[in-house]
């Protein structure tokens, strides 16, 4: 069908490539099923048994090939397959005139991501990157406070995302030839994207990666030092080798007028704990450097599932012909930042963007 939806369309008809994994755990049940402006029509996965199970579970058609999926009556495709398959699958979808929402990272390399973006532009289809954490309501509330100047001049931001990810046979995140990298590209891409949402674009990066605990080819540890274009600094730390319950996935945002501190807002859940410490007046110098207590307030807007918000926002952009809120420019920029981080880790130098 044409890439342009009819004006009378009430719901975007979706297909999914890679129906297991994150699609089955999160995006289908939490995003597509309750979405008011989207309908899941068909799914395809390289594992036929998995695909049949998912199709039965969510009452969708089970396509027996990528070609069959693209021949179905669908408007858009959500790509949730392993990263090494993204490039060829996205190009096939673009040739078929299907709009695309692709999981991050877009590809293993900048060249792959650029090829995908160009193919979608030539085909006239929308191409989005699935950075769903942008839709977390506490993150959006924090961004609004910063945009209003409540934090003052941005000074420093930190984002952490960690989990325990032991060696698993054929796990693409554990082999850079398949996933492009390890903890950094898988989780650090979310963290850096969020910090740029708060503080603006990154100007330079310095990065260290390591295989600290696990012996698989990808890094299980990464720390990045960021310099933003506005002069603020930041750090991102991601680990596949810290037990889940030991890490609170911290988010820390500091400015000349205060701070916003959070735990567990970064991740697949839709709500954590976020507190703002924003004194009304600019503080004078205190020689004793006392720390006032009880001056913070909770940032606790009504939570909304991030996967649902993501699917509805992208679908609304298609139906209403509005700007894509998850533009592929965001994903391509993220890919370039990740490449700079890995180059820094390899060379021991700061890399300018």
Predicted feature descriptions by range:
Residues 133-216, 223, 348:
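Predominantly a Rossmann-like dinucleotide-binding segment in NAD(P)-dependent oxidoreductases
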Residues 24, 64, 79, 101-102, ...:
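Hydrophobic residues in well-ordered beta-strands that form the structural core
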Residues 118-126, 140-155, 254-258:
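Basic phosphate/pyrophosphate-binding loop/patch that engages nucleotide-derived ligands
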Residues 47, 58-119, 306:
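Beta-loop-alpha module in the N-terminal Rossmann-like domain of NAD(P)-dependent dehydrogenases
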Residues 1-57:
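N-terminal Rossmann-like dinucleotide-binding module
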Residues 1-11, 16, 76-79, 313-353:
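C-terminal helix-rich "cap/oligomerization" subdomain common to oxidoreductases
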Residues 11, 132, 228, 251-329, ...:
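C-terminal glycine/acidic-rich active-site capping loop/insertion
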């Amino acid at each position: 069908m044409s890439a342009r939806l009819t004006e009378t369309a009430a719901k975007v008809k979706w297909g999914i490539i890679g129906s297991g994994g994150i699609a089955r755990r999160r995006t289908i049940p939490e995003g597509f099923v309750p979405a008011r402006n989207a309908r899941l029509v068909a799914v395809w996965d390289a594992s036929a048994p998995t695909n049949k199970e998912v199709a039965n579970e969510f009452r969708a058609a089970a396509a027996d090939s990528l070609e069959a999926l693209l021949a179905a009556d669908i408007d858009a495709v959500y790509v949730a397959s392993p990263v090494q398959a993204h490039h060829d699958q996205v190009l096939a979808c673009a040739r078929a005139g299907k709009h695309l929402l692709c999981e991050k990272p877009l590809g293993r390399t900048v060249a792959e991501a650029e090829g995908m973006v160009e193919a979608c532009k030539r085909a006239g289809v929308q191409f989005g990157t699935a950075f769903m954490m942008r839709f977390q309501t506490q993150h959006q509330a924090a961004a609004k406070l910063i945009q209003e100047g409540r934090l003052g001049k941005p000074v420093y931001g930190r984002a952490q995302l960690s989990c325990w990810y032991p060696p698993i046979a054929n796990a693409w995140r554990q082999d850079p030839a398949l996933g492009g990298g390890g903890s950094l590209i898988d989780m650090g891409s979310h963290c850096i994207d969020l910090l740029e949402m708060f503080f603006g674009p990154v100007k330079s990066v310095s990065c260290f990666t390591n295989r600290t605990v696990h012996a698989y080819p990808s890094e299980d540890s990464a720390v990045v030092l960021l310099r933003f274009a506005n002069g603020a600094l930041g750090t991102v730390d991601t680990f596949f080798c810290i037990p889940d319950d030991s890490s609170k996935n911290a988010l820390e945002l500091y400015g000349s007028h205060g701070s916003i501190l959070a735990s567990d807002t970064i991740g697949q859940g839709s709500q954590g704990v976020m507190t703002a410490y924003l004194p009304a007046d600019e503080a004078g110098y205190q020689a004793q450097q006392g720390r006032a207590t009880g001056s913070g307030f909770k940032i606790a807007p009504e939570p909304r599932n991030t996967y649902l918000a993501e699917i509805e926002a992208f679908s609304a952009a298609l139906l209403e012909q509005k700007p894509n809120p998850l533009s592929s420019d965001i994903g391509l920029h993220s890919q370039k930042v990740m490449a700079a981080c890995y180059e820094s880790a390899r060379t021991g130098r700061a890399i300018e963007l």
